[in-house]
């Protein structure tokens, strides 16, 4: 198979946590904006968008030729599914340009409820190789967001093996996780708050010490530099 490369200007996609931020991003030149609603996204503690603000934001962006993508990228449990179906029915009416999804069950519901809306596969789905990209392409996804931990060399290799029409999205700025996205269980273990449900407490940013079991109370601090930990 011969894959011909298109040379197009990359899309500058930025997050927006509120209607005001969305409008600012649009005015200052974003090509697209991604936002989260009050459920099913990974920023459970953020203010997020009401359905009314989401509709207003999408309308404003479209007036300025800017696209809006809505996140629904939790790893869903059984009791999330009916709510997700209702949510996608509401989103269908306000016409976002794409849904950002990581869970195959959520993907299936979105395809059924709003087949006219593009689906992008979230970085939360651990997209680390070209076969994963091809899998999602065959399921009907147009874009896959690379795992944030991939190198430019790895992303270039993926590009060589996927259809020219398939889009790759990559983060160039933002928080990094200690683990591949979606694979960290620290928050759930320490606090009972599930990172894959949008409630991460970021325990990877806490300060830790090492204790030898026969010397309780003697804490050795942990440092990291260019030589390691």
Describe the predicted segments one by one.
Residues 130-131:
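Conserved nucleotide-cofactor-binding alpha/beta core module
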Residues 43, 142-146:
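The substrate-binding groove and active-site-proximal loops of carbohydrate-active enzymes
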Residues 96, 141-142:
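A broad detector of the eukaryotic-type serine/threonine protein kinase catalytic domain
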Residues 146-149, 154:
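Catalytic domains of cell-wall/extracellular-matrix polysaccharide-remodeling enzymes
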Residues 2-127, 154-229:
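Active-site pocket-lining/capping segments in soluble small-molecule metabolic enzymes
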């Amino acid at each position: 198979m011969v894959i011909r490369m298109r040379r197009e200007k990359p899309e500058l996609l930025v997050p927006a946590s509120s209607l005001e931020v969305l409008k600012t991003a649009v005015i200052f030149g974003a090509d697209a904006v991604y936002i989260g609603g009050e459920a099913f996204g990974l920023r459970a503690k953020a203010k997020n968008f009401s359905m009314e603000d989401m509709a207003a934001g999408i309308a404003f962006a479209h007036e300025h030729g800017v696209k809006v993508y809505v996140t629904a990228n939790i790893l869903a449990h059984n009791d999330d599914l009916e709510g997700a179906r209702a949510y996608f029915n509401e989103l269908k009416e306000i016409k976002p340009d794409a849904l950002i999804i990581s869970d195959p069950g959520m993907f299936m519901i979105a395809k059924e409820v709003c087949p006219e809306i593009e689906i992008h596969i979230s970085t939360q789905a651990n997209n680390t190789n070209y076969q994963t990209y091809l899998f999602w392409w065959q399921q009907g996804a147009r874009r896959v967001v690379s795992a944030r931990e991939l190198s430019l060399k790895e992303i270039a290799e993926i590009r060589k093996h996927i259809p020219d029409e398939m889009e790759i999205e990559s983060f160039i700025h933002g928080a990094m996780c200690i683990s591949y996205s979606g694979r960290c269980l620290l928050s759930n273990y320490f606090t009972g708050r599930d990172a894959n449900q949008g409630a991460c407490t970021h325990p990877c940013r806490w300060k830790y010490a090492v204790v030898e079991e026969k010397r309780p109370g003697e804490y050795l601090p942990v440092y990291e530099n260019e030589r390691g930990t």
